């Protein structure tokens, strides 16, 4: 709020890596950052979005994902009408679902869109999807909210919906990028061709019996250096200088090996009627966007 020399800072990393640190609520400066006060929501831990009403600077909207490693109540959307002196939780979904993104409509600042994120982070595991991951809409600058995504209007609505990012062109046109954790359909396998998975548990004897031309075709298709042809690979395996599974390890990305999750990943949806209906805009898979989770 440059007009009034007010700066708001939401503390806490809102991405959900194991290394993400929690914050201490909302910080506020009324002198362009020279001094600061804590303006509440200390138990929110992770704040991702702050929206100031362009028509009334006393009205502020906060989106919080809540505690990272445990369930908590101070999450969702909070609104202040007194410049941060007090806060009202205007959207609470449950104690493991928070708000990861909020956008205001450029042509009508009373209309807001927010995305919720269901997740359960542990030091040894991360479930980052659920039915409660959805998009909500407000027409009164955050006083009330309505869920606008469901299984009937074209938007994914199931236990595999992960993090959702929003981009709002106007009150009618909204884009959403979704981390879809549903599995991709299995490709039809051509049995005559070798695949990297074939080498995951293959024995020394089995590898040595592979047809030389077939193995050469596999090595060429997977961009092995020319010095690694079928003969040299078989020699290395025969002398036990390498294991057959080393071919799989070499080809498989470390991240893919770690998670082994052939999921759909990123999808982009568009609504042209204010969120009443949605259409997926991409036909093919959008690769190289999310490598394990979209967090």
Where are these regions (language model features)?
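Beta-propeller blade termini and top-face loops
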Residues: 1-295
């Amino acid at each position: 709020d440059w007009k009034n020399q007010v700066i708001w800072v939401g503390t806490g990393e809102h991405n959900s890596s194991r290394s993400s640190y929690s914050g201490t609520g909302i910080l506020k400066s009324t002198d362009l950052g020279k001094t600061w006060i804590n303006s509440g929501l200390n138990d929110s831990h992770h704040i991702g979005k702050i929206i100031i009403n362009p028509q009334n600077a006393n009205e502020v909207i906060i989106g919080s994902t809540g505690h990272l490693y445990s369930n908590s109540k101070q999450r969702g959307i909070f609104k202040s009408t007194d410049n941060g002196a007090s806060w009202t939780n205007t959207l609470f979904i449950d104690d493991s679902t928070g708000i990861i993104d909020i956008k205001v409509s450029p042509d009508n600042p009373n209309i807001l869109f927010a995305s919720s994120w269901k997740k359960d982070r542990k030091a040894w595991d991360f479930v980052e999807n659920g039915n409660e991951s959805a998009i909500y809409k407000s027409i009164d600058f955050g006083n009330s909210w309505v869920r606008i995504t469901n299984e009937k209007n074209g938007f994914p609505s199931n236990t595999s919906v992960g993090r959702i990012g929003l981009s709002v062109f106007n009150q009618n046109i909204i884009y959403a990028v979704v981390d879809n954790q549903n599995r991709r359909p299995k490709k039809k396998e051509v049995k005559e061709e070798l695949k990297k998975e074939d080498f995951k548990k293959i024995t020394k004897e089995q590898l040595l019996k592979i047809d030389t031309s077939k193995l050469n075709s596999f090595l060429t298709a997977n961009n092995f250096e020319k010095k690694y042809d079928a003969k040299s690979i078989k020699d290395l395996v025969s002398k036990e200088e390498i294991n057959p599974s080393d071919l799989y390890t070499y080809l498989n990305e470390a991240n893919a090996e770690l998670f082994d999750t052939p999921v759909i990943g990123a999808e982009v949806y568009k609504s042209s009627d204010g969120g009443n209906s949605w259409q997926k805009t991409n036909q093919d898979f959008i690769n190289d966007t999310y490598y394990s989770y979209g967090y």
